Amino acid sequence: SLEDALAIYGILTGIVLPFILFPGTITNSLSVLLLPAISRASGKKDNHHVRQTTSVTVRYSLLLGVLTCAVFLNYGMDLGQFVFHSENAGKLLTLLAFLCPFLYVTTTLGSIINGLGKTVITFAFTVIGLIIRIGCLFFLAPVYGIFGYLFGLLCSQIVICLCHGIYLMKKTHITIQVAKYFVWPFVFLVSLLYISKIFCRNLIHLTNQPYLSYLLLIPVLFASFLYFYQCGLISKKDIKLFR
């Protein structure tokens, strides 16, 4: 019905999307730092610095996206119930988990392309994504409801991200190790968080203290960052690129 559709759309735009976009404040801040750094390096024809900065920022954006995706996949339903007291919010949060890596990477890639002075390129790619989203809204949403809209949202973001990435790979000649920076961290984090989720639920059943049990996420996140550091995915040297 119309009331149900408006209720779900309100949950999506007012509750779920702000939750998805919240970690993106990190990539948004990174984009602010990137724009002058890339513009300065591009003006000096320092292609090595441009390649190195692009590689590092893509890596960190991917890791942030993978981490948030794994958290929302495993704890989306719990967060929906715990924070918003809404089962629908939890379902939508879980469904949109895969949006995170592409959304965060697109933000940084767009800033790099703008720093290179190619704002028309980012505009064109954004228009392509919007056309896909509007097309899904017209053709899929009437048939599949909110899932048609979510499919269009995810597809458009993937297309924009891929267009940005392919353009930068041709422009700066960088290579992105997808297995090292996306696949294996994703498998590790999803597995680790799934195990912690089972352990937390058993602990909640025994102690009846949900707030205390979810504190176990802190050592899990610490273990994740330790894994990133030990595998060479993050480094102290990377910070110097933005100075």
What is each stretch, according to the model?
Residues 6, 72-103:
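Interfacial segments at transmembrane-helix termini and the short loops linking adjacent helices
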Residues 53-74, 79-82, 141, 147-172, ...:
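Short alpha-helical transmembrane segments in multi-pass integral membrane proteins
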Residues 109-117, 165-181:
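Alpha-helical transmembrane segments
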Residues 134-138, 189-205:
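Hydrophobic alpha-helical transmembrane segments in multi-pass integral membrane proteins
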